[in-house]
Amino acid sequence: MQVIYIIKWNAMRVKHLNLFTILVTFSLLILGGVVHNTQSSLACPDWPTCYGSFFPKMEGGILIEHGHRLLATLVGFLTILLVLFTFNNYKKNSAYQSAFHLSCVALVMVIAQGILGGITVIYKLPTIVSTTHLALSMVFF
């Protein structure tokens, strides 16, 4: 049984997806620093929405904070794709075993980051949660 088969995903395509995911993740880390330095962390008082909307008026701190959330969502989807495609290739070729396991670890870390980000907003920036969110982002990248 194949998990996903949209196009024939050979090793080169999986490699390109991986590199794109790394680039987007690095951009997310940079944007996370911008969120902190511009004090935009609580520009959206609720989570996962922003003022009750998934697409609020994007200006000022809201643009920065909600943009960070949207980019994080993209990283999540890309990581899910990596898990699916490495699993699909792992079933055909055991050389993908470590890639599959690493992509699973990455997915767990992305989910943890999403939860920590949500807790950070809901509980108004508790130091331990914010610090853990930062530390996990460093470990992830």
PLM region descriptions:
Residues 2-11:
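Short, Lys/Arg-enriched N-terminal segments with co-localized hydrophobic residues
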Residues 35-45, 111-134:
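Interfacial helix-loop-helix junctions of multi-pass membrane proteins
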Residues 27-30, 34, 74, 78, ...:
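Residues within alpha-helical transmembrane segments of multi-pass membrane proteins, especially transporters
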Residues 16-39:
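N-terminal signal-anchor transmembrane alpha helix
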Residues 83-91:
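Structural signal for the C-terminal ends of transmembrane alpha-helices
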Residues 62-80, 127-140:
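Membrane-interface loop-to-helix entry segments
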Residues 36-66:
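Extracytosolic (periplasmic/ER-lumenal) interhelical loops and adjacent juxtamembrane/interface segments
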Residues 16-18, 95-106:
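Membrane-interfacial loop-to-transmembrane alpha-helix junctions, especially the N-terminal start
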